[in-house]
């Protein structure tokens, strides 16, 4: 999918998604995580579709992995959910509870919300 098409879809659906999730996060596009971060920081992250940064209050979409409207909408929903979650608690689940991604309550919540993606399909 072209970057232009990803921008078009994002511009169409994100205002409604962000309103519904009460998120004021901004969206930026990069081809992949390596394009945004140094290679050392991005090790083992080459499959990321998107991510939310609590430091910048930004959602980063990685265009190399966006091949459908569904991917884009799901990613925007998922990261909007993270934008409303506590960073300290998010990290504590990993660091103090030793949970992995699949068992992390915040990831479970974000993935649950992703299932509502068709609500934003046009």
Task: Give residue ranges: language-model regions.
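Short active-site segment of divalent metal-dependent hydrolases/proteases
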Residues: 77, 81-85
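Active-site scaffold of zinc-dependent metalloenzymes
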Residues: 36-70
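Hydrophobic beta-strand residues in large extracellular and virion-surface proteins
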Residues: 25-29, 50, 59-61, 76
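Short helix/loop segments within enzyme catalytic domains
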Residues: 114-122
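Zn2+-dependent metallopeptidase catalytic core
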Residues: 2-26
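Post-HEXXH active-site segment of zinc metalloproteases
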Residues: 70-74, 86-114
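N-terminal low-structure segments adjacent to metalloprotease catalytic domains
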Residues: 1-4, 60, 85
